[in-house]
Regions:
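Hydrophobic positions on the alpha1 helix immediately C-terminal to the Walker A/P-loop
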Residues: 16
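Post-Walker A helix-loop "phosphate-sensing" segment adjacent to the P-loop in P-loop NTPases
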Residues: 22-33
């Protein structure tokens, strides 16, 4: 089963992905976590250190190249894996970032989404931008403006693909979010990651 997690920065994508895979492995199941980052955090830190800001189109070009490479490599690894595969981010995230910056969707990323194996479940972790902003400030590894998070949330919900996403409330304690995720996976036809398996791992 292939699951993709999306959502604004601070929505808890990485935390939920890591916890889901850990729960599945603890229950005796085969599970694989794949990260489809675009290098935004590193580029932001580098820009801040150098005191320069890359134009949105240049930043998008670099991010798209990095994310596309990671997504293609992730699908290559997922193809031969038997078990639960959780992808932390996907190409939809780049399309939402383009929307946030007022850039066109283009043709390449939507085409790539269509030809790649379709995930069994694309989960959108929905959180109030103010709570997401507080989480980002608390972790202290990067920074985001509240207005950008609000704009990104709007951009996600404006994606043509969004109606096919499973929207989960991501506010509150991580344990509650994880329970909602496991229930969504079960509803989509997969076994709950936290239920023990008597089968041998692949």
């Amino acid at each position: 089963m292939l699951i993709v997690l999306t959502g604004i920065d601070g929505s808890g994508k990485t935390t939920a992905a890591e916890a889901t895979v850990a729960a599945a492995r603890q229950a005796g199941k085969s599970a694989l976590l794949l990260r489809n980052y675009a290098g935004r955090r590193r580029m932001s830190l580098l820009s801040a250190r150098l005191g320069i800001q890359a134009p949105p189109r240049l930043a998008d070009f670099l991010e798209t190249a990095v994310r596309t490479f990671n997504v293609l490599n992730a699908h290559r690894r997922a193809r031969n894996f038997h078990g639960l595969v959780v992808m932390d981010r996907h190409l939809h995230c780049q399309l939402a970032l383009r929307g946030m910056h007022g850039l066109p969707r283009g043709r390449f990323l939507p085409w790539l989404i269509r030809i790649l194996p379709r995930p069994d479940l694309v989960i959108y972790l929905d959180v109030d931008p103010r709570e997401a902003h507080a989480r980002i400030l608390a972790r202290g590894t990067d920074s985001e403006r509240l207005e950008d998070l609000e704009s990104l949330r709007d951009a996600y919900q404006s994606l043509p693909e969004f109606p096919r996403f499973t929207r989960l409330t991501a506010g509150g304690p991580p344990g509650d979010v994880l329970s909602r995720m496991h229930a969504a996976i079960e509803k989509a036809g997969g076994p709950r990651p936290d239920e023990c398996s008597h089968a041998s791992p692949h």
